[in-house]
Amino acid sequence: MKQITGIYSAPSQHWVGDGFPVRSMFSYQTHGQQLSPFLLLDYAGPYVFPMGNNKRGVGVHPHRGFETVTIVYAGEVEHRDSTGHGGVIGPGDVQWMTAGAGILHEEFHSESFTRSGGELKMLQLWVNLPAKDKMTAPGYQSITAAMIPTVTLGKGAGKLRVIAGHYDDVSGPAHTFSPLNVWDLQLNHGRDITLYQPEGWTTALVVLEGEVIINGSESAREGQLAVLSQSGDALHLEATTQTKALLMAGEPLQEPIVGYGPFVMNNKTQIAEAIRDFNSGRFGQI
């Protein structure tokens, strides 16, 4: 059994641009190797925006050395980047962007969501790239809700969406550079499930709604992060109410993590190179 090593409550909300009120559930500055290959998770919302005419969001900014995974639960987000990719993602959709050697992108509320207003609820997860892949070509995976397989869990426990990795013989659509699982969980009140992750893997659970008892001992509720030991291969979850959560698990990279703002590399020299390349326009343009 994977043991609980900590349960952490989200800090107070802060704004990213004028469109994303986020709670930073963790970052590599706070958890580092403990959550490798995952670097950061921002939980935006739930927040109700009024109707408007001007798109809210965050303007053009760079990334290098990792991937950003945006999962939308309510509202719509529009993306554009320097590779020429772009589009709108809505409830259930996922955008998996590989920054790699360098990318510029912008993220705003979609035009229709701006006009209508309503609830925004989404996550952005940063996934580190192995050292050998940090300078891979930037890329973009647009994963619609219809592309993501949903598994009905046994004994009426609920449902599980396989965004990346595998659950039993079901595979998620996302291509990844290292072995990992990203699962959306919907657990029914009073039901329980045992989930398995490989021995030695990082495992963490973010509760988005409701409350869950982990391994029969400690509870995690909305806005909390539960981190489990790399040792062991199972965790037991019991929902005390209707619960939604994101489960992340992956093989630790066991490589140095050196970050500066939107760049995450393996040493300071590489960070300096990233800054120079960005300032000299080598990340392209939108």
Region annotations inferred by a language model:
Residues 1-286:
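Jelly-roll (double-stranded beta-helix
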